[in-house]
Amino acid sequence: MRVSRLMLVTLRDVPAEAEIVSHQLLIRGGFIKRVTSGIYAYMPLMWKVIKKITSIVQEELDSKGCLETLLPQLHPAELWKESGRWDGYTAGEGIMFHLSDRQGRELGLGPTHEEVITKIANEFLQSYKQLPVNLYQIQTKFRDEIRPRFGLMRSREFIMKDAYSFHADETNLKETYLEMNDAYEKIFKRCGLETVAVDADSGAIGGAESREFMVTAEAGEDLILLSPDKKYAANQEKAISKFADPIFLDKKEPCIIQTNGQRTIKELCDNQGFHPSQILKVIILLAVLEKNDLQPILVSIRGDQELNEVKLINAVSKYLKKSVISIKTITKEQLDSQKLLDIPLGFVGPDLKDSYLNKAANWNKKFIRFTDITASNLDSFICGANTIDQHRAFVNWSKVGGLPEIVDIRNAMPGDISIHDPKQKLIAKRGIEVGHIFQLGRKYSSCLQASFTNEMGLEEPFWMGCYGIGISRLAQASVEQNYDQSGIIWPLGIAPFEVIVIVANMKDDLQRELGEKLYSQLKDEGVDVLIDDRKERAGVKFKDADLIGIPWKIISGRDSATGIVELVERSTGISKSLKAEEAIKELLEEISNYKKSILQESL
């Protein structure tokens, strides 16, 4: 390929809308073009990267016996209603684009394909003799993001690989889960990425167990917690840890203390001299359920701990046996709108009576009450007195109506003790999720009535797994992990081109002829090579080559009359002056050795 034919347009200035480095570099390098909020065109260079990632994914999945297919992007609403996910994905802040056709039938643009593939499997897979089967596709998906940002990291249209496996028993599901874990590790190594596999929450997909693959980068939206010995790693949404003991509070006679205007933990500690771990923080929240059912929740947690919203959603969902769309913190304005003027926000105790909800316009009239494990073992604590400007001191659970249901709803934090070794303190890193694997169990097969005939001749639901890789996100995540002040540094395995031949001066016949010769020889050797044959200044060509991140440069310049070229490695900046033949030989060896090492690491 010739740069003169590439439609390459690069920018020197940082685009105003690009917040993180990878987004900036992809726009500046002409890899992507924003069409509208959260929607991007993949330009020729980016499409080459996408195709190389896709090829790696296909090779590794095919080697595991997976079968490639292509599923429809438009899904009938009936399937999603049957699984119970339609309302959660379309109502309020739901992420599914949905529409009605000319006959008035509801359809959704698929963000994921569990419902569709399960129905298809039910028709094609009749017997245990046909199992296991693992089907995958690579195609465009859609999410109606509330706030699209960071380029391809959180877009409304994206390319994804999703796979779905069907099994006769749980043991076989777990075996496939481990096989897919192995395939993912190989895929990411071949893509030149450093990833961390972490325990994760299954979210709206559901299932018993799941694992995320994170590219560690400062721009990552997720916080991951790891032990230094690498034996524990989890997304903070899922992470558990051993928490520090509270500061002991004397067991004195319970009393009421005046705390005028002291609504927060900090205000209470600053004015009364308490430690946050001695205070019971009581929070009123609202769970938004399907069909806009609104359920108040009263949560008690130790004052030095943070509430984990994902864990709380899971706890509420398990308690009610219903899907929870979202959790909202209650504000004074919301209380006013419900005509609940008597609830003393900032001074609430764990024994706040349900009768406070009697006047609620459209909330359920009874609290769900949870206590985090950190608060459950407090023998003496401070808490709100359910009266404005008053707290209770030196009380225990028997004095405040008894202990509510105990659940783990706290955030594990950096510095906490790891659960597997008291010598290991958790450290934090930011991560970009590029892959996620799930053990779905029988969640979808049961609700969609998808079954097979087992060895005993009886019908039973499939055991299922699902496995996703964000192809377009992975491409940008690679940039976030591989760049310098000059531009992108693509790993060789997914670079749009492996080598760029730069003719410094196209007006110089010797430089041009040597450059063309190098280009032809490299093409003949099977190298993915680009030649910069533009009539531009050499400095412009060098800057563009660094910006777009081609791993190797061969420069035909001033010494071309003697057959000398410059060989430059993008990642290190190391430059060598060599005879053209020697440069090609060394380059071929470097490319071959790199590919061998990557393949060896992934074995």
UniProtKB/Swiss-Prot annotation:
Consists of three domains: the N-terminal catalytic domain, the editing domain and the C-terminal anticodon-binding domain. Its main location: cytoplasm. Signal peptide: none annotated. Catalyzes the attachment of proline to tRNA(Pro) in a two-step reaction: proline is first activated by ATP to form Pro-AMP and then transferred to the acceptor end of tRNA(Pro). As ProRS can inadvertently accommodate and process non-cognate amino acids such as alanine and cysteine, to avoid such errors it has two additional distinct editing activities against alanine. One activity is designated as 'pretransfer' editing and involves the tRNA(Pro)-independent hydrolysis of activated Ala-AMP. Homodimer. It is found in: Cytoplasm. The keyword Nucleotide-binding applies. It catalyses: tRNA(Pro) + L-proline + ATP = L-prolyl-tRNA(Pro) + AMP + diphosphate. Keywords: Aminoacyl-tRNA synthetase, ATP-binding, Cytoplasm, Ligase, Nucleotide-binding, Protein biosynthesis. The gene is proS. SUPFAM superfamilies: Class II aaRS ABD-related, Class II aaRS and biotin synthetases, YbaK/ProRS associated domain. The keyword Aminoacyl-tRNA synthetase applies. Belongs to the class-II aminoacyl-tRNA synthetase family. ProS type 1 subfamily. It comes from Prochlorococcus marinus (strain SARG / CCMP1375 / SS120). GO terms for biological process: prolyl-tRNA aminoacylation. This is Proline--tRNA ligase. One of its GO terms (molecular function) is ATP binding. GO terms for cellular component: cytosol. It comes from the Bacteria. Pfam families: HGTP_anticodon (PF03129), tRNA-synt_2b (PF00587). Its EC number is 6.1.1.15. InterPro entries: aa-tRNA-synt_IIb, aa-tRNA-synth_II, aa-tRNA-synth_II/BPL/LPL, Anticodon-bd, Anticodon-bd_dom_sf, Pro-tRNA-ligase_IIa, Pro-tRNA-synth_IIa_bac-type, Pro-tRNA-Synthase_IIa_type1. It is an enzyme of class 6 (ligase).
